[in-house]
A protein has these predicted regions:
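A short acidic, amphipathic alpha-helical/loop segment
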Residues: 129-133, 238, 299-302
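Long, hydrophobic, well-ordered secondary-structure blocks that form the structural core
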Residues: 119, 123-160
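Histidine-centered divalent metal-coordination motifs
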Residues: 60, 252, 256
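C-terminal active-site subregion of NodB/CE4 polysaccharide deacetylases
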Residues: 14-118, 125, 153-174, 244, ...
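Extended, charge-rich helix/loop segments that form flexible
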Residues: 47-54, 153-245
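CE4/NodB-like, metal-dependent polysaccharide N-deacetylase domain
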Residues: 110-111, 123, 132-144, 196-222, ...
Length: 389
């Protein structure tokens, strides 16, 4: 179901003030503020101030057809990726292998504005669309691979279901297997949630058959999905080809299901993931990416015991010598990210903005605490935390 604010005459001070202080700003105003900041030299200054920070960029898959119209962060076009890498090279961002970058970061010997490119999940388009571009541009890339769907050759269920509902032409649907009838004009999210839960309990072969039934009910061609091999991860042969081409393949859990507090499940996910990939990859499997960015600081010890040396998040920001190797920040790139926003992240301007916003928030908290403490005798003393950059 394919179910900006213009402001004239804003001064530069007003634009930057809005940008730094407001919790939510319309995208056109943000971009206007970024263009203004660049023209005033703030991008250049930010790059100098943050040059010792490691930039790690996060991509996911490549569109093999028109999936980018559905989720343009999950599936980027090949030309989009090419232009990004060409920008990095043109602007002098050295692109390093993950292992080399982390080793240099640990001893504070990174080249200025060092950059790492990572890709999550192991989507088929990384091999069919991305690899030729990676080879042509001669860049190191790390691909974090989740292995359940490598082993079970069906489309990724959660993403396929979401796509089918996005494509649905019908306004009302009677879902298969007695799940229920829904008015998609008002209940699409509820219907999709029910279907996601239902399919999670099915074995792979039955899950595939249910996807066909669901597509028919929603009046979407499943033949197109199967014919173009949409929403599939790489198979073993493609992963071997990726590894043979020098791509760094690393850990991303087996089922892409990551608990916060179940240590045994964490161990199982890493062990199964590593055991499967060891049949394909000769280099050590010791770097990890948290599925969907779910993690807790307490998991660092768990991962270290499992022989993992680093773990990436989807928290925005740069990485310095004092950044935990188990909470590495990344810049998530994709179709919705404009050129000026990408430049703002890469130069470190947005890093400085986030630091300033944290500082302003801490100041407001301190003032509020001071106000309560000065409200009269007998009031309890409230602790105030300090904000850091």
């Amino acid at each position: 179901m394919k179910h900006g604010i213009a402001q004239d005459g804003l001064t530069s001070t007003t634009c930057i003030g809005l940008f730094l202080a407001a919790p939510s700003i319309p995208v056109p105003i943000v971009r206007a503020g970024l263009y203004l900041a660049r023209s005033l030299g703030f991008f250049w200054l930010a790059r100098r101030l943050t040059r010792r920070g490691l930039r790690i960029i996060c991509y996911h898959g490549f569109a093999v057809a028109e999936e980018y119209k559905y989720r343009s962060t999950l599936f980027v076009r090949g030309e989009f990726f090419r232009k990004r890498v060409e920008y990095l090279k043109r602007k002098g961002y050295p692109i390093l292998a993950l292992q080399d970058a982390l080793a240099a970061l640990a001893v504070d010997r990174l080249p200025p504005c060092a950059t790492v490119i990572t890709m999550d999940d192991g989507w088929r388009g990384v091999y069919t669309v991305g690899l030729p571009i990676i080879r042509e541009l001669n860049i190191p890339v790390t691909v974090y691979v989740t292995t359940y769907y490598v082993e079970n050759r069906i489309p990724v269920y959660t993403v396929t279901v979401s796509y089918l509902f996005w494509r649905a032409a019908a306004q009302r649907v009677d879902l298969p297997r007695g799940i229920g009838a829904f008015d998609l004009r008002h209940e699409a999210e509820i219907a999709e949630e029910v279907v996601q839960k239902f399919g999670a309990e099915l074995p792979p072969a039955e899950r595939l058959e249910f996807l066909r039934e669901l597509a028919k009910a929603l009046d979407v061609s499943f033949d197109e999905i199967e014919g173009e091999q949409l929403f599939r991860v790489m198979d073993e042969q493609q992963l071997r080809g990726l590894a043979a081409a020098g791509i760094d393949i690393q850990l991303h859990s087996h089922r892409h299901n990551w608990p916060l507090y179940d240590q045994k499940m964490v161990e199982s996910e890493i062990d199964e993931n590593r055991r499967f990939l060891q049949r394909i990859v000769s280099r050590p499997l010791q770097h990890f990416c948290y599925p969907s960015g779910v993690y807790g600081p307490h998991q660092a010890e768990w991962l270290a015991r499992l022989g993992v040396k680093s773990a990436t998040t989807i928290d925005p920001g740069l990485n310095y010598i004092d950044t935990s190797p188990f909470a590495l920040r990344r810049l998530v790139d994709g179709g919705p990210v404009s050129d000026i926003e990408f430049a703002a992240e890469m130069t470190g301007f947005m890093e400085l903005v986030r630091s300033l916003r944290r500082w302003l928030s801490a100041r407001r908290t301190q003032r509020a605490g001071a106000g309560m403490n000065s409200s009269g005798p007998g009031q309890p003393s409230l602790p105030c935390g300090k904000g850091g950059a």
